[in-house]
Amino acid sequence: MRAGFRQHFSPRRQNESHPMKKIEAIIKPFKLEEVKDALSDIGVEGMTVTEVKGFGRQKGHTEIYRGSEYTVDFLPKIKLELVLPDGRVDAAVAAIVKAAKTGKIGDGKVFVSNVDDAIRIRTDEKGDAAV
């Protein structure tokens, strides 16, 4: 490994704080626009959206196709990923939960984890400036 690479991209030490967090939200597909608008209203400018399939307590559901009944185990969901400065995370999570909630099983989950660093490839900006 090149010495310069290690120095420039060294991992954060365990006792250092994490100034950024990654929010991953799994939501119902029809709630995407509502969640996107809620995040935009609080100034969140970027996110990654992926179509995913999964199940939790909701499990699958039964459908009939050409006269045969079968169980659909994996349900279509949307996964949102965004990285924000630590101070903006609570507002973003609250916006996601409020906009995604139907009150019914299968509304989804929100996960928040630490992000050690971010690098904008085009400009080499790091940390908050990169997100």
Language model: regions and residue ranges:
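Positively charged, small/polar-rich N-terminal and surface patches that mediate targeting and assembly
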Residues: 2-131
